[in-house]
Amino acid sequence: MAQDVLTDLSKVRNIGIMAHIDAGKTTTTERILFYTGVNHKIGETHDGASTTDWMEQEKERGITITSAAVTCFWENNQINIIDTPGHVDFTVEVERSLRVLDGAVAVFDGKEGVEPQSETVWRQADKYNVPRICFVNKMDKLGADFYFTVDTIVSRLGAKPLVMQLPIGAENDFIGVVDLLYMRSLVWPGDAKGDVTMGAKYEIREIPADLQEKAEEYRAALVETVAESSEELMEKYLEGEELTVDELKAGIRKMTINSELYPIFCGSAFKNRGVQPMLDAVVDYLPNPLDVPPMVGHDPRDEEKELTRKPSADEPFSALAFKIAAHPFFGQLTFIRVYSGHVEAGAQVVNSTKGKKERIGKLFQMHANKEMPVEGATAGHIYAAIGLKDTTTGDTLCDSANQIVLESMSFPEPVISVAIEPNTKGDQEKLSTAIQKLSAEDPTFQVSLNEDTGQTIIAGMGELHLDILVDRMRREFKVEANVGKPQVAYRETIKRAVERHDYTHKKQTGGSGQFAKIQIAIEPLDTAEGELYEFENKVTGGRVPREYIPSVDAGIQDALNDGVLAGYPVVGIKATLVDGAYHDVDSSEMAFKIAGRMAFKEAARKANPVLLEPLMDVEVRTPEEYMGEVIGDINSRRGQMQSMEDAQGVKVIRAHVPLSGMFGYIGDLRSKTQGRAVYSMTFNSYAEVPKAVADEIIQKSRGE
């Protein structure tokens, strides 16, 4: 079969491999690529040689950061795989991949069962209604326990597992699986090291006598569960008739696609055992693009008008950009999922999210970081495109005559920042290039400039996130720079109005001097309404000439960058110019700007200035036995409890906690809950800092 884009969409699977960090996700992907003939040599994560981990830091840290898209073939079916990261700081990558997948393989560590990050990723997959099959990996590991892992899938995820296989042997003696559908054994001969076929061949044998009874018990449970998928099967089952393998497969497929149950397989990807039956299951049970409901979007000219696109080549072209990656030769690669229609390489399309025309230069199907050029892109597939200049993550590309905006992905605001100081002018230029490219790739990475210190401030989703971004700047863009400690972004405001404050700026040093006299009033604005600054001019009778009034406004705005308490930006201010005086010769725009700046500074000191801090919405999911400790810990961080409720097998605690109290929280939470609790944090609002805490921050900022 020509391994090109298949036109029969029933033979296509767009899947993700999702798991907790270290459950063996990348190794599993490598084995899939090996058995499907894409790879000729198996790369190990712990050797730093795997196909999908292609960024330098991924190879070093042995974790997957960027989801690489890989295309492979199995039994005449095309499987497009997205490898997703399992670390909490990269949830944005995971959300992006899940958004464009039709199904997923959830990989679990056979010894650890469901781990905190497996839970986070599982909930994200629930959010996007992604059907899943499960692969219990590392069955060769000391202490591996298949039945324990299945129990944790029920207790921690509240999911309904359908056991499809039982392990034969355990730890070093793990040699294969019992296939409950066909009631037979699949055994991989030889030790992984001595087996020249690398697990590509397995033998079909009788079920071992010591497992026969257990296999019959699990097979009966499987048949009973699947009989519920339709009335015909239920009737047949109740009449005592045998259900055929094809009937069982059809029932399992239907229930998997509806997310009513999750088929469970087991193996050891590292020892090359159990991967092929899992690939068969991807084809047998996970949805193809035709099984997925039509995509819903809206008309860019009328947000209320709902539009849909079916996964057919006859519909108008529509696609979603879900990832931007920098490529060493092609520059920017934009990964797209085509939902409907067809587009040729070189065609002009519209980015309906931004209202801009774009030209698709070349199109590729990707094998990690190798590219296979294709002439056109068709519904149901994932491609990498080059030549798109204005398209960023979450944007829709579509046919200009039939425009649609597919629902975009929403990304959380960054919560932590560090200052970066380039060592030389050359480094400053490299830093600008790096920032431009990295922020195009990653919507949760933001950049600003500290006017006073001239430092570049970068903000992201967590400490590891910023570490990796800084590391990429150094490696990929050769930026040499000093990096500060993580900081909280405080603000300042006032609580009291000052009705009149006079200020005269006067300088006489021979020749023409400088003169400006103004009287201003200031009052607080409600920042919750988004009102950060307002200026009003109430001067009458030309006492301050009209051309100088914008200078007073500019001077006050200048003063807002640098508050009177600790030098943080000032928000929530209304300033009014009430009166003033000028001199025909000595007055100038600069004199009035200085007067505006100094008048505001003095007035602000009288207006009861206070410090504001970012308050975060923190949600912790913890097993009930750790609830007391978790709540006590939140209180010690100046947190305020908002609510508490039950979810599947866990307690969900919601609280408002100052960001300054959240540094190092992930480590503390792990140690208090044996790594079983997970948390998420999003920005809520700015709130006043209690006086004792504020005094400490102010003293520190003044170097006292």
Curated annotation (Swiss-Prot):
CC per GO annotation: cytoplasm
Name of this protein: Elongation factor G
Family: Belongs to the TRAFAC class translation factor GTPase superfamily. Classic translation factor GTPase family. EF-G/EF-2 subfamily.
Gene: fusA
Species whose genome carries this gene: Pseudarthrobacter chlorophenolicus (strain ATCC 700700 / DSM 12829 / CIP 107037 / JCM 12360 / KCTC 9906 / NCIMB 13794 / A6) (Arthrobacter chlorophenolicus)
Cellular compartments annotated: Cytoplasm
Domain tr-type G intervals: 10-290
One example GO MF annotation: translation elongation factor activity
Alphabetical list of HAMAP family matching this protein: EF_G_EF_2_B
Origin: domain of life: Bacteria
Function in brief: Catalyzes the GTP-dependent ribosomal translocation step during translation elongation. During this step, the ribosome changes from the pre-translocational (PRE) to the post-translocational (POST) state as the newly formed A-site-bound peptidyl-tRNA and P-site-bound deacylated tRNA move to the P and E sites, respectively. Catalyzes the coordinated movement of the two tRNA molecules, the mRNA and conformational changes in the ribosome.
Primary location group: cytoplasm
Keywords of the record: Cytoplasm, Elongation factor, GTP-binding, Nucleotide-binding, Protein biosynthesis
